[in-house]
């Protein structure tokens, strides 16, 4: 090896990202600054710990490990076996489940694995309609779940935007689905897990609960757990659970656990992402700590405070409030669309997403509402006092937008709110060890 080749080899293992790829480094730096200086209210987002970041950015990314602990198709897996075992045991302890699969790479893949394990193409299943707060993978016509299977969608009552369990029962008895899915992406109220299981048992169906949005609240003891009631429970590991992006499948049924394991590997995935599984294990360990319960209590209290304060400012909250970490704001009374509101709030450094509301007359790209969530800001240390401020800032921007002749005419209001947002976020820094790099 020449000296030049030797130097190149050393640089490969020692040069940091800024040296190797300044363009990517600068984009990442920009995203760090955005997260630091904006108030994150997207309900599906959170902020992970430094420990989770370190686990995900570790040497475990180098290791291929097809199979399961002690049943791998590659050698050299003794340490990743330890990691996956820890992730499995912590997940089981956290949620009180007998079996856990920590390998799903995403929420979509975990739900696909359940379909693969329990259904054949053309079979019938039930799920909450996307327009009522469901998820793409619960039967949307544009998703694989809606293309491969016969989907029966249930919804919410128009008068109170609450799931009509009598309608769920009627549809289930009429259509006899093999699988019923409970859970959603923008439903702000408690779910009646017990009633769903009774309906499933009555028609001989399996009950799948996708608790992706509320898993952290379940772990923290502030939301009823579906694990004692559902045949299978799936969840993403980010959102309110505050881990890396990925999936998790739980069950108390050994036979179903074997079907799930086979569906994940070799049915759907190949080698698992061991660095992500390590980060999941770290996050599960954090969620087992008593402080996570306090965090979960604050998440719900903050969401309720946000909803009540917005109501006091004349905003209509879908279903009248929230039982969890998220709320939907119906903007029709303000003569605004979700798209305009999202953009205006974004310019003021308050990040949220436009979202359809039940029986929405607008298209999905426009919407009549926005979805707001409390997990990320609560992770930063925001309490109810800060969420009262946030609600008033949202009202200031959106009332200004409503009264402006054009979006551009609201610029002064948005910039004034942006300055107030900066004053708040400066009190709650992220990853202080990164700010000097």
From Swiss-Prot:
Its cofactor is pyridoxal 5'-phosphate. GO terms for biological process: glycine biosynthetic process from serine; tetrahydrofolate interconversion. The record marks 238 as: Plays an important role in substrate specificity. Gene3D superfamilies: Aspartate Aminotransferase, domain 1, Type I PLP-dependent aspartate aminotransferase-like (Major domain). It is an enzyme of class 2 (transferase). It catalyses: (6R)-5,10-methylene-5,6,7,8-tetrahydrofolate + glycine + H2O = (6S)-5,6,7,8-tetrahydrofolate + L-serine. The modification N6-(pyridoxal phosphate)lysine is found at residue 239. Its EC number is 2.1.2.1. The keyword DNA damage does not apply. (6S)-5,6,7,8-tetrahydrofolate binds at residues 130, 134-136. Pathway: One-carbon metabolism; tetrahydrofolate interconversion; Amino-acid biosynthesis; glycine biosynthesis; glycine from L-serine: step 1/1. The keyword Cytoplasm applies. Catalyzes the reversible interconversion of serine and glycine with tetrahydrofolate (THF) serving as the one-carbon carrier. This reaction serves as the major source of one-carbon groups required for the biosynthesis of purines, thymidylate, methionine, and other important biomolecules. Also exhibits THF-independent aldolase activity toward beta-hydroxyamino acids, producing glycine and aldehydes, via a retro-aldol mechanism. Its main location: cytoplasm. Pfam families: SHMT (PF00464). This is Serine hydroxymethyltransferase. InterPro entries: PyrdxlP-dep_Trfase (IPR015424), PyrdxlP-dep_Trfase_major (IPR015421), PyrdxlP-dep_Trfase_small (IPR015422), Ser_HO-MeTrfase (IPR001085), Ser_HO-MeTrfase-like (IPR049943), Ser_HO-MeTrfase_PLP_BS (IPR019798), SHMT-like_dom (IPR039429). The gene is glyA. Homodimer. HAMAP family: SHMT. It comes from Bartonella tribocorum (strain CIP 105476 / IBS 506). Keywords: Amino-acid biosynthesis, Cytoplasm, One-carbon metabolism, Pyridoxal phosphate, Transferase.
